[in-house]
Regions:
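C-terminal luminal/periplasmic domains and tails of membrane-associated envelope-modifying transferases
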Residues: 1-116
Length: 116
């Protein structure tokens, strides 16, 4: 996990997966709200529990059921078989905002736990 992944990611090569906590290159983190203290271009996200393990294991390890479901749907869109019917249906579903409530409930739980 690190920020400013451009040069580092290039130098690390194609076999290294870097979780970008600024969310510039991460589909899940880019859809989560930024922490309250930020500066332009540096919107740090709270790293969801189980997310680094999910990336490493290549299977969903996120304990929050709403965020885990959202991740599964998003992963199908971003990494599923290109022309599969399931992926195309999920693209429509996500573009219509039908899964936004999953992120909203996750964020509500974060706020209730004291995260800002």
């Amino acid at each position: 996990m690190r920020g400013n992944v451009g040069f580092y990611g290039y130098a690390a090569g194609p076999t290294v997966h870097i979780v970008d906590y600024y969310a510039l290159a991460d589909p899940l983190l880019a859809r989560l709200p930024a922490k309250t203290k930020w500066r332009i271009g540096h919107f740090v996200r709270i790293m969801p529990a189980g997310y680094p393990e999910t990336i490493q294991a290549r299977s969903n390890q996120i304990p929050d059921s709403d965020l885990a479901t959202y991740y599964d749907h998003l992963h199908l869109v971003t990494s599923g078989p290109l022309w599969s019917a399931a992926r195309l249906k999920m693209i429509v579903r996500m573009n219509l905002g039908r899964d936004e409530y999953l992120v909203a409930r996750y964020v509500d739980r974060l706020k209730a736990a004291g995260y800002q």
